[in-house]
Design a protein with these regions (language model features):
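Surface-exposed amphipathic alpha-helices with a cationic face
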Residues: 106, 129, 162-171, 252-258
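Auxiliary Fe-S-binding modules of radical SAM enzymes
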Residues: 2-11, 189-293
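Structural preference for beta-strand elements that scaffold enzyme active sites
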Residues: 78-80, 111-113, 135-137, 173-177, ...
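Active-site beta-loop-alpha junctions enriched in small/polar residues
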Residues: 84-86, 117-119, 139-143, 179-181, ...
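Generic structural signal for well-ordered alpha-helices
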Residues: 66, 99-102, 125, 160-164, ...
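Conserved strand-turn element in the central/C-terminal portion of the radical SAM core barrel
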Residues: 153, 165-186, 237-241
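Conserved Radical SAM active-site core
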Residues: 1-135, 143-146, 157-158, 169
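Short acidic, glycine/proline-rich loop/turn micro-motifs
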Residues: 147-151
Length: 293
C-alpha cells in the first residue's frame, strides 16, 4: 500500500467537470492524487495543476464540494467517476467522498461508471443498485502478481477479479479493463478467458508511453525484460504498429471462435449474454480523438 505523506482537504466549487474523454460527458474525481501510484499512469501529469511538488502517489487532497441538489441536471449524460484518481482508494474507507457523491446523484437517469482497482467498491453495491444505469470498471492487465506489484500499490489481481465476479453476480454491469497492455508481457487471451464469465464488456487498451514515466518504464523493461527491449524500441521510439495489428488480429480470431461481439473505439450500453462479453478495442487513440472532435 502506498504511503500518503501529505493529506489535506480541498474546497472546490463543484466536483462535476465536463469531460473531453471519449467515455464521459462528465469526469468526476472526489480526490486529487492517487495512492495506487501506478508507474504507467497518465494521470500523473495532473500533478503540475495541483500545486503539489511531492511524488505522485504520496499526496491526497480530499475534496469538499457544495451538495448536488438537482441530480436530474445530469439526466441523459454519462458520468465517469475516477478518471484521474481512484474513488475507492484505501482512504475512501475514512472519508467516504465517493459514497457521498453516489448518494447525491440518486434520482438521475445518467449512466454512471465507477473506474477502480480496489475491492473497497464492494461497499457501494447497495447505493449502486439504486441507480438506473450503473457500471463498475476494473483494471486488470496481468495475472502475474509480481509484475503487478512492480507497477502499482493497488489491491491484488485476485481481489480485483473476485470483486468483479461479485458485482456481476449481483446484476451490476461490469467491465474488465485490460489496460495498459504491456507488449510481450500482458497475456490478453488469458485475461479474456478468465474474465469472460464475469464481465459484460472487456476493454483493451495499449500501453502509451509519454512524459516522465516513459523513461522509467523503458528502464524497467531493460532491467527486468531485456529480451523485450528491441520490441519496445520498435513501438515506442520508432512508432511501429505491427505488434498491435497482430494482437488485434489474434483478438478478432478469439472473438470469432467464441462468438464474442467485437467493436473498435465504441462504448455500447447494456448487459451481455452470459459468457459472451463484448470485446472493445481501444488501441488507436488518435482515431478516438478525431471521432470526438
Amino acid at each position: 500500500m502506498a504511503t500518503v505523506t501529505t493529506l489535506a482537504y480541498k474546497d472546490v466549487k463543484t466536483v462535476m467537470t465536463k469531460s473531453s474523454l471519449p467515455v464521459g460527458g462528465y469526469s468526476v474525481n472526489p480526490y486529487v492524487g492517487c495512492p495506487h501510484a501506478c508507474r504507467y499512469c497518465y494521470a500523473s501529469f495532473m500533478k503540475r495543476f495541483t500545486g503539489h511538488t511531492e511524488k505522485w502517489g504520496t499526496f491526497l487532497d480530499v475534496k469538499n464540494w457544495p451538495r448536488i441538489t438537482d441530480p436530474h441536471k445530469y439526466d441523459g449524460q454519462r458520468i465517469v467517476i475516477g478518471s484521474v484518481t481512484d474513488g475507492y482508494n484505501e482512504h475512501e474507507a475514512t472519508y467516504r467522498r465517493t459514497r457521498m457523491l453516489l448518494e447525491q446523484l440518486r434520482g438521475t437517469s445518467a449512466e454512471i461508471m465507477v473506474t477502480t482497482k480496489s475491492d473497497l467498491v464492494l461497499r457501494a453495491i447497495d447505493v449502486l443498485k439504486t441507480l438506473p444505469k450503473e457500471t463498475v470498471s476494473r483494471s486488470v492487465n496481468t495475472p502475474d502478481e509480481a509484475f503487478k506489484d512492480d507497477m502499482d500499490d493497488a489491491p491484488s489481481i485476485e481481489r480485483r477479479l473476485s470483486a468483479m465476479k461479485t458485482f456481476h453476480d449481483e446484476g451490476i454491469r461490469t467491465v474488465c479493463f485490460v489496460s495498459p497492455i504491456f507488449p510481450g508481457i500482458t497475456d490478453v487471451p488469458a485475461i479474456i478467458d478468465r474474465a469472460k464469465d464475469q464481465a459484460d464488456l472487456i476493454w483493451l487498451e495499449n500501453l502509451n508511453l509519454r512524459g516522465q514515466f516513459k523513461g522509467d518504464i523503458m528502464r524497467y523493461i531493460a532491467d527486468k525484460y531485456p529480451q523485450l527491449v528491441p520490441l519496445y524500441e520498435e513501438i515506442y521510439n520508432k512508432g511501429k504498429r505491427d505488434y498491435w495489428q497482430a494482437l488485434e488480429a489474434q483478438v478478432k480470431q478469439i472473438c470469432s471462435e467464441n462468438d464474442f461481439p467485437y467493436l473498435r473505439n465504441d462504448l455500447p450500453y447494456g448487459r451481455s449474454k452470459p459468457g459472451k462479453p463484448v470485446i472493445v478495442n481501444y488501441f488507436y487513440h488518435e482515431e478516438i480523438r478525431l471521432n470526438n472532435k
